[in-house]
């Protein structure tokens, strides 16, 4: 057995940290001793250990039998016990009422703090939620104790406790309280569900709790997809990591540090990288030994804190991992086998919990964001900080002022005076919160500190909350807020608070003024009820004649006629038809216009009011329209109304009759292309109106159309003549020759026709319509006046059809229409034109059409309308039919004061009208009697409990208005705390009404704890996303220097580096500095808070190290630092969800993400700047450069996210099958890439055996057999795996056991012909080639290794094109 496999005897069952069983280290390890479980409760965990022990010591068969026996035992007693669950088993603990009572007291205290403006709305919310969360936790403990002491055999308790069904959080909901719920946006509702399912939920609680349940189901569905995609990307990035070597021989390793002296499972299955000695220099574990639980225990016992182990991160095997760096395969706890696809196992191990985690969202329904690590004082005494302590002020999320530790130190509570004893020591880590001062004396059981364990980064998100005003009044800022104007990218200016401070609203009665009102009273005047505060007037814009209309609703309309136009030479004639009234306009010369609108309606500018009914332009049938030259229309077509004529001329009309028919062809009564007379029946019940040649259009034996074209038909066979005309038709002017014997005196339309009998020309007559330039209309009037709009009528001729249009119709159509349209000038859009019918002044029997332009003014009636307007009083200033000039006042409105008080106007910005004013009433003030001198000044703002004089405290919040000897007057107000960076919606001095938004608080909150937050976080880490608002990192190591600016807010932070170079960092407002003045920092350390950008971190590490070490070392070390932090970040997310994943899986993935470097300067190598290439290849290239004396390549390490890494893999087949197939394939084609088929995916895709598992041995042995006595050509992939593509993977070769060199000992020895064909296929000249595999091996041709640079290495570089042939 190899040394790496532990002996059977040492393999005792794995104990978990908190298992109470005998520790195998305190008990001599006997091979066959089962874990003791005498007189113990065997729960799920103990069963696990028992089965695991049986499996490890006795193998599968025995374990299976034992498990069967356990099952029988279990079923037997479960049957006899008949445990069932009933309502009576759900026992609610007595303590519940007290706990809820305490929580409610705490919460009402918090609400009071909020009312006094001591904490912000956000802090109140957080505090309420945390109070409930804590109550919930305490209630769970109460439930546990209740069952444990009073009813240990309760069915519910037994089920949950044994792990058979259910868990504590579900029992909590049954008998404790359901707890806090989240709303659909994921925000926690601050009303918890206080009842449990045993007591029953109220309707409100039921609705709230059903939110969570539905959300859980939906989330599960969505997350399963997310998690599956994550697994796919992971598999793709790691699929070609296979264990290909026994030992890579690396000297590098990673260090694992103990947590609290314990390693837990973190060393299990790893190989030591060097001998481990204890304090007395005794060897505990030799190098290259696999650490099993027993050894891990011994290391802990020898109190060794750091162990160097081998890891896939540091493995130097090319494109794979070697057995020793990987350690145990976790499936069977032995060293991993060659050919194991560890990449895929790693990918599945990380991806699979993602699915589970998603599934595990909604069982509890509740959501918690509890605070942890609170330390209370155990004794009464005095607080002492140690000498190196550094603290700074900090405000907790609950609005408590506390101190935050900047460095780690020890805090002591020293007993004072008589009660001596041991002092209590508390270790405070950097970033922890302290609630006591140095030197303060405290009692026992006081919260002293909240210790932050390590750097647990919960993911935070920025959130906002509105502060809504509860009372009307005037806004006042505290000085400390220091509002600052911030302009965003869109140029919007917002006010932001820079510091924590209060925003006050001082009470008063706020009046909204109507749009055009102006105050008529000055600020500071006292007013009584009924005093006029402001006046608004409404005036006419153009002037004219007033018409008062009846009032509608709460306002009445005043119309002012600015322009009117009466059509005196038209009579308005009304006709009644069955479809309603029709109005015609008749002019004195008898032309009649049809009116499109009825009197009493409104029309707008440019609208057509009447059409001329003109019979001259009406045809008898359908036909074809042609414009003769000279006739032109305006381009723009308003399709409804046709084309406006711009110049008159002649319109040509070729009549033809079209019957649209959709009937069966059997009904046709005539023949196609035949001449028919007018009145012929063409189809049953359809008669032709004209004579002419008939054309029938049919489709699938259905008649579509029948066309009758009039004219005369002339037979003609002369090609020359026929070619002059088309089937569509040509116009022929009078006197032009058409055919011999045809004399044309007028315009004809000629078409070429082929009838069944012969060919010929159809000559059709053309009708001419003359269109005038201007419509002939009776005189029309234009009305003008000094100011305001004019009115006019305009006639427009419009052609209905465009040039060349065919109108399919039997009835006649109208070719030209004449419209009358309204023209008004300078009309404003809100002015409409009204159409009225009036009697003629001279003859009452005749009605005339009257057009008027009205200006309409709505005047409000006096109402006690909404309270904020105050009571208004409106007066009309005009009478009916009065003539008013432009600008005359029509009505005035006064706003009256409702109660006695003092007026204040807001601050006026120039040109802006005042829209609100405030009256400070008696009820907005309060007098406080004092007996001694006041300790406050006028203008001070106080809250409940602040001292007014030595003996009197304030009873309300507000601002001091006046102070006399015996009393102080306070104007009531309400403070609102505003946190830094909040957006202020109001300015100092603004007037607000109740319900207005005052500010938008910006705060960070922890996202609700759930793997939901876990999955995106894992994705963010593995995709190496750049976080927003990331922390500022120190670029190089040095000493921090913090300078305060002129105002206390601005701080400049710089780091003095080694060569006294000062590097200054720009700080954004709202960033907390995480370092203190004079502190030593290393490159890559966070200077401010925020998420860390991994790319930036790598750069900082690398730049810091490359000044101190050679490039390759700096790259290696910076990469390994980054790898360590990535592994621990990923682990943190999974640990916080209670999922255990072995480090080595994450290491395999992280290794794939960090294997590449980017070439910055190629030196003398054949690499390209910007190329991504493996660090190992660059290293080899640079070594070769060192031999030949060329300039080496310079590079920086890069971090690729898993998607990027998958697309940048060497195998283009694998990359193309993952994403962006066309791009990957075209690039590969352009670069002329080869795919060496190293991974699993490539081989699967082209249908070969995969090079892992059983396929691996064949792969390796074939290669060794081909390599013959030169196994070194397998070392570098150029010789070895490149040949793999030519091998048939389906046969294997047995190697002889003795390492023999003679050529006869090789079994599958290629014949000379084989060698020859292989050489030819590869174009190899045996004389110049040093390819051992192609030459006949014999015993003499072996060099001693040290004579040459390693030929395999150089050869490989040439092959890869990284080294030129010199």
Curated annotation (Swiss-Prot):
InterPro entries: DNA-dir_RpoC2_beta_pp, DNA-dir_RpoC_beta_prime, RNA_pol_Rpb1_3, RNA_pol_Rpb1_3_sf, RNA_pol_Rpb1_4, RNA_pol_Rpb1_5, Rpb1_funnel_sf. It is an enzyme of class 2 (transferase). Binds 1 Zn(2+) ion per subunit. Its cofactor is Zn(2+). GO terms for biological process: DNA-templated transcription. Residues 1354-1366 have a biased composition (Low complexity). It catalyses: RNA(n) + a ribonucleoside 5'-triphosphate = RNA(n+1) + diphosphate. Keywords: DNA-directed RNA polymerase, Metal-binding, Nucleotidyltransferase, Transcription, Transferase, Zinc. Pfam families: RNA_pol_Rpb1_3, RNA_pol_Rpb1_4, RNA_pol_Rpb1_5. Residues 1295-1305 have a biased composition (Polar residues). CDD domains: RNAP_beta'_C. Zn(2+) binds at residues 248, 315, 322, 325. Its EC number is 2.7.7.6. Residues 1-34, 1291-1366 are annotated as: Disordered. GO terms for molecular function: DNA binding; DNA-directed RNA polymerase activity; zinc ion binding. Residues 1-20 have a biased composition (Basic residues). NCBIfam families: PRK02597.1 (NF002724), rpoC2_cyan (TIGR02388). PANTHER family: DNA-DIRECTED RNA POLYMERASE (PTHR19376). HAMAP family: RNApol_bact_RpoC2 (MF_01324). Belongs to the RNA polymerase beta' chain family. RpoC2 subfamily. This is DNA-directed RNA polymerase subunit beta'. It comes from Prochlorococcus marinus (strain MIT 9301). The gene is rpoC2.
